[in-house]
């Protein structure tokens, strides 16, 4: 049976049962439309995720100490003391594919101002962290390298921290808040970034000199991490090597 005869038989079958033919065609149309819609949604989601990753820093590299295994039990990587300040300095001096580097230590606790308090996380970093994570200071200034050298008790805060501690809308710059009983003078407020694709509030944070957090809150000399930014996204692999 050739193709022409098959087409004739199919046409006669559809003509004899127009309702079935209509439903068959409708099913095909709906199926094709569904596939096109899902592809469009997939492309839209892909673009949205790519945009959010780019906002976080698509060329960002995070270095953490490897977790040790003792007695068959994997230890908490954050407790490892193998990552030193010298490692950070070596990256700054020797890596030609990296544009910005920041040490990283952090601690969670209550931030307090007057009668207001809220749980948050303080990140001990260097000013390069803003470039790496694409944060901008909206009001006031970023703390300086001099503040790092002196382990100054200064900080820059996110909008969520401002809303929680200053619900009356007063300007927080110049005010002194407390974190784990340690006073910090606010020198700047970050521009809002909102929530990321994982549902994390990128404005619920305090940034302070890493030396201050190391010495006066954590009482450690090692680093919990190093965050870098490759010169270009395509240089990320070379920077890691």
Segments predicted by a language model, with ranges:
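Short, glycine-/polar-rich solvent-exposed loops and beta-turns at beta-strand/coil boundaries
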Residues: 55, 147-149
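Conserved amphipathic alpha-helical interaction elements at protein-protein interfaces in regulatory
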Residues: 13-16, 20, 51, 55, ...
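Hydrophobic, regular-secondary-structure patches
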Residues: 43-121, 125-131, 163-164, 214-215, ...
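Short, strongly hydrophobic transmembrane alpha-helices
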Residues: 19-47
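Amphipathic alpha-helical segments that mediate coupling or scaffolding at interfaces
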Residues: 10-13, 28, 44, 48, ...
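Mid-to-C-terminal secondary-structure elements
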Residues: 128-143, 152-240
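N-terminal Sec/SRP start-transfer signal
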Residues: 1-30
């Amino acid at each position: 049976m050739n193709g022409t005869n098959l087409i004739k038989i199919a046409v006669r079958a559809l003509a004899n049962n127009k309702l079935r033919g209509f439903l068959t065609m409708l099913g095909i149309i709906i199926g094709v439309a569904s596939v096109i819609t899902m592809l469009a949604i997939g492309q839209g989601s892909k673009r949205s995720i790519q945009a959010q990753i780019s906002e976080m820093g698509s060329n960002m590299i995070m270095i953490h100490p490897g977790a040790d295994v003792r007695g068959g039990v994997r230890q908490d990587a954050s407790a490892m003391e193998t990552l030193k300040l010298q490692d950070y300095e070596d990256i700054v001096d020797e890596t030609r594919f990296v544009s910005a580097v920041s040490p990283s230590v952090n601690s969670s606790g209550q931030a307090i101002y007057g009668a207001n308090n809220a749980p948050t996380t303080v990140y001990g970093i260097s000013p390069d962290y803003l470039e790496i994570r694409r944060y901008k200071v909206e009001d006031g200034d970023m703390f300086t390298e001099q503040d790092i050298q002196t382990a100054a008790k200064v900080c820059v805060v996110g909008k969520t921290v401002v809303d929680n501690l200053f619900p009356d809308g007063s300007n927080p710059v110049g005010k002194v808040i407390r974190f784990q009983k340690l006073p910090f003078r606010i020198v700047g407020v970050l521009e809002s970034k909102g929530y990321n694709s994982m549902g994390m509030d990128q404005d619920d944070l305090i940034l302070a000199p890493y030396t201050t957090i190391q010495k006066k809150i954590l009482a450690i000399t090692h680093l919990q991490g190093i965050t870098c930014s490759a010169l270009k996204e395509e240089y990320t692999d070379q920077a890691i090597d």
